[in-house]
């Protein structure tokens, strides 16, 4: 075989472009970008309905503790935030009628047998409780869940109470020498709610002047 007819040197195996690290990195980046865009679009699509549902839930909760006759404003639009040394930042929904503050509503958290108990309470300008409701809890079904208005009317026993009715010694469950009933087989849960509502009255008393001050005029 002459030089002119010599066979070409053997060639190495052809590289598959799909296995290139550069291509793999580009594909991974493109996939991540598309996924992020899809998640952003989904978030935008659901944000509005979620916000609307939250606003509806808040209005429904306020209506359970705050009599409609006491306000001619929208308490969810007139909000004050208290900076309290014990409770931290507390969002307060202010009810007014004829420009005068008639009541305030706010949420505090206590801790029962099963964990956190969120309590919403409305307090009139004179310091009496207008109503209280448990918004969420993880207490034992059939025992501690009697703090729910749908399970028992126990929570309604706080309406009309104040820091002086009963006095300090009375703001306990009966087992501890107070005036509020406990549940059979469940004392920790009602004790936590009683304590939380008493804290709420104390919070109102500490910030009474600030809470009852006229709201700034809307521009």
From Swiss-Prot:
It is found in: Cellular chromatophore membrane. Part of a membrane-bound complex that couples electron transfer with translocation of ions across the membrane. It comes from Cereibacter sphaeroides (strain ATCC 17029 / ATH 2.4.9). This is Ion-translocating oxidoreductase complex subunit G. The keyword Phosphoprotein applies. HAMAP family: RsxG_RnfG (MF_00479). The complex is composed of six subunits: RnfA, RnfB, RnfC, RnfD, RnfE and RnfG. The modification FMN phosphoryl threonine is found at residue 187. One of its GO terms (cellular component) is plasma membrane-derived chromatophore membrane. It holds the Pfam family FMN_bind.
């Amino acid at each position: 075989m002459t030089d002119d007819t010599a066979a070409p040197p053997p060639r190495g195996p052809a590289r598959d472009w799909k296995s290139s690290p550069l291509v793999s990195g580009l594909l991974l980046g493109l996939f991540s970008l598309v996924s992020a865009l899809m998640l952003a679009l989904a978030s935008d699509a659901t944000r509005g309905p979620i916000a609307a549902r939250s606003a509806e839930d808040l209005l429904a909760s306020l209506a359970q503790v705050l009599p409609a006759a006491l306000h001619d404003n929208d308490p969810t639009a007139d909000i004050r935030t208290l900076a309290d040394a014990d409770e931290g930042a507390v969002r307060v929904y202010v009810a007014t009628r004829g420009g005068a503050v008639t009541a305030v509503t706010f949420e505090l958290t206590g801790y029962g047998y099963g964990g956190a108990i969120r309590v919403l309470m409305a307090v009139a300008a004179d310091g009496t409780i207008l109503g209280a409701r448990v918004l969420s809890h993880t207490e034992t079904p059939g025992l501690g869940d009697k703090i729910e208005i749908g399970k028992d009317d126990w929570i309604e026993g706080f309406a009309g109470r104040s820091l002086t009715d009963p006095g300090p010694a009375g703001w306990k469950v009966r087992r501890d020498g107070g005036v509020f009933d406990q549940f059979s087989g469940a004392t920790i849960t009602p004790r936590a709610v009683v304590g939380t509502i008493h804290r709420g009255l104390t919070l109102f008393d500490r910030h009474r002047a600030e809470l009852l001050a006229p709201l700034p005029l809307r521009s």
